[in-house]
Regions:
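Lipid deacylating catalytic domains
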Residues: 3-120
Length: 120
């Protein structure tokens, strides 16, 4: 639920500092049950937290992740003035428990995007 808390802060906490980039990993933010709890601040048409996020939002998921897998792609749920701006990256994990940060961090796609976000 860390990504839900981070998003909630970006949208609802006035004193939340601005950030240059956001990386969500195995996030349940695509689930309608989560989105319903974020209204009225969240809308599909303008869900991107552009007041607090000045750079990229990269969402990494595994389709078999039990937390994110039911709706892992969030670029269509958090638009910026009706346009998709989030980059959804499918990073296949392995093993029985796919919602494991060590498995995500072992993925080449995630590491490549993270280096880009950090300007390394």
């Amino acid at each position: 639920m860390g990504t839900v808390i981070a998003y909630d802060c970006l949208k609802r906490v006035p004193d939340c500092p601005k950030i240059d980039g956001l990386l969500t990993i195995g996030s349940p933010l695509g689930l309608e049950e989560i989105q319903q709890k974020m209204t009225p601040e969240w809308t599909r048409a303008n869900g991107f937290p552009s007041d607090k996020l000045s750079g990229s939002w990269i969402n990494v998921y595994d389709a078999l992740d039990p937390v994110a897998g039911f709706d892992p792609k969030i670029s269509n749920d958090y638009l910026k003035t009706l346009l998709p701006v989030i980059e959804d990256i499918h990073e296949p994990n392995f093993g029985m428990w796919r919602h494991d940060i060590t498995k995500y961090l072992a993925g080449q796609k995630l590491r490549t995007r993270l280096r880009g976000l950090l300007d390394l």
